[in-house]
Amino acid sequence: MDINPLLYLQAFNNDATTFNTQGHLLEQQSDSPYFDTFANAMQAYLDTKRGGNDEEGTIIIMDDEDFNDSESLEDFLQMLNDEELNDEFSSDDEPEERVNFHEVNHHEVNHHKINHHEVNHHKINQHEPSENPQATFDITEFIKTEDEED
């Protein structure tokens, strides 16, 4: 059974509970049963999407403007990750230009000046992850009962 996450996001779109991209609970103004329903709905989606409740997932409450600008949940989450990565660096820290080695015009390279012992063509930039890091969390970390909050 495939569950559409957008249905859950739309259903709880007007909730006053706000999360950041790391999944920390920033503000909870809704009543506890409503929040528990939201958390259970999100957990059901994660269980279905990821194949079990041991995996981590991302929950974002989108406002209507963000939702309408994004074609899908994946596009929206990628947009958030891109913004988060851009915000992590100041202009002084970030390199001015990143070279994509796959786009280098090899006809302009003078192969006689390359020290082949220092070049490993198969492990270019191996210390950087191949994909953008995903902001994830375990939803069970902040699902609380009223007794635990006191």
Swiss-Prot record:
Sequence repeats lie at residues 101-105, 106-110, 111-115, 116-120, 121-125. Residues 101-125 are annotated as: 5 X 5 AA tandem repeats of [FH]-H-[EK]-[IV]-N. The keyword Repeat applies. Keywords: Repeat. The keyword Repeat applies. Coiled coil: none annotated. Belongs to the asfivirus D129L family. This is Uncharacterized protein D129L. It comes from African swine fever virus (isolate Tick/Malawi/Lil 20-1/1983) (ASFV).
